[in-house]
């Protein structure tokens, strides 16, 4: 028979009393009522904040978006397949935030700032809220520095400034992403940090973009945020804000940043899916009523900081896909009204071999020549006017049989100007090279050449100028002005190269 020893029992009780922890832990918890399609309805969570992160029993994180009288609508940041009805959920007391640091440069991450490139963890000592307020009026200044894209058509006629928001819009397969990636490639050596946000893209397309950046050495100053088409809607909705938070981190450290959203219409579709599942009332095209606010609060974060804040900048280039050229659809009109201009890419131009397929007639930059160096303003002024007159004449010439000599000359000049705007993908040009190209075209030096010879001649001219007249580039880069000395050097180079070229073509 077991004997009970009172002293042993009292020792155990005494030990337990001594080890008793008096701390009272208050946890705001709730119970899962219903789960499915990336949405969970929770009973309880009485003091939860709008946008607060909540944690499910099995580890999935969600965001409380709908706060109703008897339940809370939560969107899941994962598939949530292990969440069960009746399981508990606890509020974390935190709003969605991500770690930020210099170590993110050169990495591919997801919307939660977790690396997805298989190169290990990223160290970060600081964090930023995913949804930060946009800079106020006093903390901004007007845009005055150019952000060179390396594309003649854009830098000469639709210039983009640091701190501007310029929409790239067009049908599918018209080279929208190519314009954006060329802009990133052109920032090499310009001290600009680039963030490329891929929302709902094919994983193969994102991999292709990353490979291009790696091959051209652009990943050194670029961060890629990717949520592909198979990602949960919540993460596709969050990805642009994550990219903006990373770009802001550098902007507030007095650096220049450029962020590309590819594309916000996919983010709007993900948000529509979440809203409809949360039973929010649908509006036009079944989008929720606050879809404008979805994009405006994102794009308003792009700014040129005032001198008090160090003059950092964040330039936003959202890309929106249209359906058969319809720019009057809901999302395109919303984004057009928020941005400071748009670059319109045309499928007809693309198919007729004009690439980049920029429709200069309906593309605008509301910042204009404030975002150009003086040298570019001096040579590019005539270009847009001559191209506009050419487009008008070309339409008229289709119906007229006999044209006078002046009209024929103007048409010939226009065709050569259109030819000089053509560029290969991933071959951005420096400002100096663009000035050479535009000056040669607008001053009639190409008129004597066949259209097929224009591209070849310009390539050779740029090479000749670089090797034989290096002082031309020095004058433009140091003074930012197209001086008389620079013009004389350029005229000399054109004449010398033209003689060489014509001899070469004859042989």
UniProtKB/Swiss-Prot annotation:
Enzyme category, top tier: translocase
Pfam families on file: ATP-synt_ab, ATP-synt_ab_C, ATP-synt_ab_N
Protein name: ATP synthase subunit alpha, chloroplastic
Catalytic reaction annotation: ATP + H2O + 4 H(+)(in) = ADP + phosphate + 5 H(+)(out)
InterPro entries, alphabetized: ATP_synth_asu-like_sf, ATP_synth_asu_C, ATP_synth_asu_C_sf, ATP_synth_F1_a_nt-bd_dom, ATP_synth_F1_asu, ATPase_a/bsu_AS, ATPase_F1/V1/A1_a/bsu_N, ATPase_F1/V1/A1_a/bsu_N_sf
Binding residue positions for ATP: 170-177
Domain of life (superkingdom): Eukaryota
Membrane topology per record: Peripheral membrane protein
Entry's family note: Belongs to the ATPase alpha/beta chains family.
GO cellular component entries: chloroplast thylakoid membrane; proton-transporting ATP synthase complex
Species classification: Eukaryota, Viridiplantae, Streptophyta, Embryophyta, Tracheophyta
Keywords for the protein's UniProt record, in alphabetical order: ATP synthesis, ATP-binding, CF(1), Chloroplast, Hydrogen ion transport, Ion transport, Membrane, Nucleotide-binding, Plastid, Thylakoid, Translocase, Transport
Keyword Electron transport: no
Intracellular or extracellular location(s): Plastid, Chloroplast thylakoid membrane
PROSITE patterns: ATPASE_ALPHA_BETA (PS00152)
Protein task: Produces ATP from ADP in the presence of a proton gradient across the membrane. The alpha chain is a regulatory subunit.
GO molecular function: ADP binding; ATP binding; proton-transporting ATP synthase activity, rotational mechanism
Site feature location: Required for activity: 363
Subunit structure: F-type ATPases have 2 components, CF(1) - the catalytic core - and CF(0) - the membrane proton channel. CF(1) has five subunits: alpha(3), beta(3), gamma(1), delta(1), epsilon(1). CF(0) has four main subunits: a, b, b' and c.
């Amino acid at each position: 028979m077991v004997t009970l020893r009172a002293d042993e029992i009292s020792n155990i009780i005494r030990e337990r009393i001594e080890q008793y922890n008096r701390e009272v832990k208050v946890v705001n918890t709730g119970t899962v009522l219903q789960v499915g399609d990336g949405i969970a309805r929770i009973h309880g969570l009485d003091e939860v904040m709008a946008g607060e992160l909540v944690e499910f029993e099995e580890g999935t994180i969600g965001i409380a978006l709908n706060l109703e009288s008897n339940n809370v609508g939560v969107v899941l940041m994962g598939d949530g397949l292990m969440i069960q009805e009746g399981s508990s959920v606890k509020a974390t007391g935190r709003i969605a935030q991500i770690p930020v640091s210099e170590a993110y440069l050169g990495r591919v991450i997801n919307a939660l700032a977790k690396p997805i490139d298989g190169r290990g963890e990223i160290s970060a000592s600081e964090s930023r809220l995913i949804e930060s307020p946009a800079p106020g009026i006093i903390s901004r200044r007007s845009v005055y520095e150019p952000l060179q894209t390396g594309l003649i058509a854009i830098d000469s006629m639709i210039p983009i400034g640091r701190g501007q928001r310029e929409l790239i819009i067009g049908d599918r397969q018209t080279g929208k992403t190519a314009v954006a990636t060329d802009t990133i490639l052109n920032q090499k050596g310009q001290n600009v940090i680039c963030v490329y946000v891929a929302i709902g893209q094919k994983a193969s397309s994102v991999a292709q973009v990353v490979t291009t950046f790696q091959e051209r050495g652009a990943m050194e100053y670029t961060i890629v945020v990717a949520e592909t088409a198979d990602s949960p809607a919540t993460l596709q909705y969050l990805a642009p804000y994550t990219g903006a938070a990373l770009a802001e981190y550098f902007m507030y450290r007095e650096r220049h940043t450029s962020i590309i959203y590819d594309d916000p219409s996919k983010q709007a579709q993900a948000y529509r899916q979440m809203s409809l599942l949360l039973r929010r009332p649908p509006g036009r095209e079944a989008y929720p009523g606050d879809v404008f606010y979805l994009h405006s609060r994102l794009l308003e974060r792009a700014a040129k900081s005032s001198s008090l804040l160090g003059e950092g900048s964040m330039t936003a280039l959202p890309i929106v896909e249209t359906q058969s050229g319809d720019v009057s659809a809901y999302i395109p009109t919303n984004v057009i009204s928020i941005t400071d201009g748009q670059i319109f890419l045309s499928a007809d131009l693309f198919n007729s071999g004009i690439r980049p397929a920029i429709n200069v007639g309906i593309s605008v930059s509301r910042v204009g020549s404030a975002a150009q160096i003086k040298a570019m303003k001096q040579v590019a002024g005539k270009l847009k006017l001559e191209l506009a007159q050419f487009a008008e004449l070309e339409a008229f010439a289709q119906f007229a049989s006999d044209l006078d000599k002046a009209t024929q000359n103007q048409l010939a000049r226009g065709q050569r100007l259109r030819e000089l705007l053509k560029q290969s993908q991933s071959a951005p040009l420096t400002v100096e090279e663009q000035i050479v190209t535009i000056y040669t075209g607008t001053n009639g030096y190409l008129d004597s050449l066949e259209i097929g010879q224009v591209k070849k001649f310009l390539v050779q001219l740029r090479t000749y100028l670089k090797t034989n007249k290096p002082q031309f580039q020095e004058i433009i880069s140091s003074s930012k002005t197209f001086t008389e000395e620079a013009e004389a050097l350029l005229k000399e180079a054109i004449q010398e190269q033209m003689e060489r070229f014509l001899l070469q073509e004859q042989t």
